[in-house]
Amino acid sequence: MKWKKYTIETTTAAEDFMSSMLMELGIEGIEIEDNIPLTKEDQADMFIDFLPELPPDEGISHVSFYIEDDGSDQSDMLRKVKLGLEDLRDTVDVGSGVISSSETEDLDWINNWKKYFSSFTIGDILIKPTWEEVKPEDADKFMIEIDPGISFGTGKHETTQLCIKQLIKYIEGAKEAPTVLDVGCGSGILSIVALKLGAKEVVGTDLDADCMISTRDNMQVNHLDEKLGTFYVGNLIDDTELQKKVGTEKYDIVVANILADVIIPMAPVIPDRLKEGGYFITSGIIDFKENEVKEAIEAAGLKVIEINHQGEWVNITAQKLTK
């Protein structure tokens, strides 16, 4: 299926008026591009480690919308858009108001990413996408299959690999099968690795409800009993009901492959989740945030026992010492 993309050059002052006008005409799927700087509140809400530098804001905005290119005459719709644009001139500076057009394919965005995800190994563990066959040379490896679906997490990212290496170390080295809390479980890859390595129970949390579906599906693909995993939607940082559901002093390992700006405010709630002697394994930490995360973990009362690097990413492992 093809789509016509129409882009209106306007001003940042008019972009909201323009969007409202298009929606009143029944047009959905509106896209706004501008260089308005983000506020500190916006940046905090985004939970990202660094922002790309934007060009200077010159007050120009591009408002785009899409109409299915089914061969029908679109001139009437465009006429209404142009009339609406002219009406707005009485209210706000709409700038040039020039409308340009282009064609775009209806790409299968849910599946196109698959060409970038292929099998890889971490030690003796083979992590492969569900749609890929096992290569003969990998037939004797310990296999985990993952289909992230529309949730985040194939396992190939350095931060996930750092966490997996630590899970291998601390689960295989445990005297008894551990219980694991996976914060920000995503596709469930770390929960599944933990269970495959011998964890007796996994609890996972994520802000995205779609992750619950992906995690359950991936557990089934890996022939894991669903009773071994319990998963909740919510924010462990400040959701007291979720904290009650997750429990206190219950876990031998808490693993969190999330961003530094999430780990820092989350650190104070981790000690209460861990048993004495339990481990907090975390990554998703860009290198220039290492000290800040380390200080937050130590301030929460945990002892940092190991720091590992892979590329520009960092793993910090800490322990809750016995009293």
From Swiss-Prot:
The keyword S-adenosyl-L-methionine applies. It is an enzyme of class 2 (transferase). It is found in: Cytoplasm. GO terms for biological process: methylation. The lineage of its organism: Bacteria, Bacillati, Bacillota, Clostridia, Lachnospirales. S-adenosyl-L-methionine binds at T160, G184, D206, N257. Belongs to the methyltransferase superfamily. PrmA family. Keywords: Cytoplasm, Methyltransferase, S-adenosyl-L-methionine, Transferase. One of its GO terms (molecular function) is protein-lysine N-methyltransferase activity. Methylates ribosomal protein L11. This is Ribosomal protein L11 methyltransferase.
